């Protein structure tokens, strides 16, 4: 079973998005984090669950929120390269 590793910038995106949601409603940031955790657990069980997003990346959507986890499957781990809003700044993560 592969482990999930977040790129340092993807982890920062997760924290930033959760903080924004928390300003909208108390507890919503935690709900966002829990949905991201649910998606990462699904990736561990089914690494190819996300649709092919580019030549080397896949994307799985986060339930209830307009975010996707962009990831690649390496020999030793599933690497989350971005926690990206589905409608904002497309492709900003490509250098990762």
Predicted regions, residues:
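Enriched for short, Lys/Arg-rich terminal
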Residues: 30, 68, 72-96
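Basic/aromatic recognition patch in beta-strand/loop cores that engages polyanionic ligands
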Residues: 45-78
């Amino acid at each position: 079973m592969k482990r999930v590793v977040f790129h340092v910038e993807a982890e920062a995106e997760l924290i930033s998005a959760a903080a924004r949601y928390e300003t909208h409603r108390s507890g919503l940031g935690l709900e966002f984090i829990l949905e991201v955790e649910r998606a990462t657990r699904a990736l561990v069980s089914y690494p190819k669950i996300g649709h092919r997003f580019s030549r080397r990346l896949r994307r799985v959507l986060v339930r209830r929120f307009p975010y996707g986890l962009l990831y690649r499957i390496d020999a030793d781990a599933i690497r989350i390269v971005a926690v990206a809003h589905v409608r904002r700044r497309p492709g900003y993560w490509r250098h990762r």
